[in-house]
Amino acid sequence: MENTEAKRNIKLIAFDLDGTTLHGFAELSERNRRAMEKANDAGILVVPATGRVRNFIPPCLTELPFIRYAITSNGGAVWDILENKVLCTDLIPTETALEVQKIFDDYELYVEYYVHGRGVTKRGNPDKARTVFGFPEEKYYFLTKDYTFTDNLSAYLKETHAEPEKINMMFIPESVRPEILARLQKLGGIELTFSNVDNIEINKKGCDKGTALYSLCKVLGIDPKNAMAAGDNGSDLGMLKAAGFAAVVGNGIEEAKAIADAVVAPCIEDGFAEAVERFALR
């Protein structure tokens, strides 16, 4: 990272979605969209870097003609959206995923497995979200996801030998969250991150958005020093450290702000656009 105000040679901008760029689940503001267009016109690649799996990235981004590459599943998979193919992966071994699921089987949880660009969950989970899982009304948009359903997640893993890009748990009851977290921390081979106070995200040990950014830069022949990252939360720390310039929105966590080269306006005030305008286009 750097702190100088000198002109930067930014060739790629990797940006988090939730809490950094999007307003709500799938709304891209006009200012943020224009900032992306201006960056593209300046020859800068604009790359979503998200904890979401490939098919959960909203059309407001995937339908933009200049969005070609995406870091997904917190670095578990990097996609060429135009060609609809995976460029590189860092997957959780099936055996490790089964160890994780063995813990989950002791609780009533909303669990998602991200496998080859799609979300997999237990049949009926979205229907129970409002009651059993207690989803708050403002989060109901999470229930509109296009899932692959299974009756038993352990059986699914055994039968398909799936190697997940990421495992995601949403809206974990506070009464059991510390216990679940403690049990997961005893397992080897996994990386735990948090994008909200009530979720847990699991990747392969050593996998994060930063390692994926390095991989994508290598594929494209770009020096990571010429990359800019924009984020807000714990799952963004890896790429904020990996990029040559790190911008954190005003609503970001203190740990992210502490490693930022610049702290910009909050997400809701289009801090992403501010970062692009001030530090990539000058």
Predicted ranges, named:
Residues 30-136:
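Active-site phosphate-binding/coordination module
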Residues 43-47, 66-68, 166, 225-226, ...:
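Short active-site oxyanion
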Residues 103, 107-110, 114-230:
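Conserved acidic, metal-coordinating active-site core of Asp-based
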Residues 26-43, 89-96, 149-154, 206-218, ...:
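Short, acidic loop-to-helix structural element flanking the phosphoryl-transfer center
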Residues 19, 52, 75, 231-233:
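Active-site metal-binding loops of divalent metal-dependent hydrolases
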Residues 2-12, 28-29, 185, 200-282:
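Mg2+-dependent phosphoryl-transfer enzymes with acidic/Ser/Thr/Gly-rich catalytic loops
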Residues 9-25, 100, 240:
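Asp-based phosphoryl-transfer active-site loop
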